[in-house]
Amino acid sequence: MSFVVEPHIEEYAVAASTPHPLADLFERLAAETRERTTAPQMMVGPLEGRFLELLVRLTRARRVLELGTFTGWSSIAMASGLPPDGRIVTCDIDPEAQEIARRYAEEAGVADRIDYRLGPGLETIQSLEGPLDLVFIDADKEGYLDYYEATLPLLADDGLIVADNVLWSGRVAEDDPDERTRTIMAFNDHVRKDDRVVAVMLTVRDGMTLIRKR
């Protein structure tokens, strides 16, 4: 994944933000992810992780759904922003990545707020009842539209859907995008035209769209 924002600017933004109390743990998590996985760029990173935690706090979320656990940076960050009775359901199809996530969540002291599910995202969604306060979509890009349509009816009236990687390393702005990029573009276009919601796309890391019901 290429940065949409130049790396030195992202580094400045991280340095200018309040350090996370779990910063050392996240550094070790990142190191193990780079060592043990083939796609470490899938981690959210310090700036996006801090932003997700802030969103949880600002929305006063208690029920969070994450589609795409990977090695757990985002779920740990969001769990850090939950009240004691808050819970995150997070799902993934990679058992090795989720094992890493579980271990670091235990060390971070937030494992009791995270419900790990191993299996496809749609199956996880279908097992849940609303309302959900926050949904973070960060799984297979081909499934984004289905995840969006399946979670929107479960979303609380003042809830928030956050879709990650919506700028796809800037390739969404290219003249001749590849098939996967066109999939992301189709999702972005669908959300923009959806009269049920208000959406704002941000240039944080690889692009994030914040979606709220009208």
Positions of PLM-derived features:
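A short alpha-helical cap/connector motif
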Residues: 1-134, 141-162, 166-214
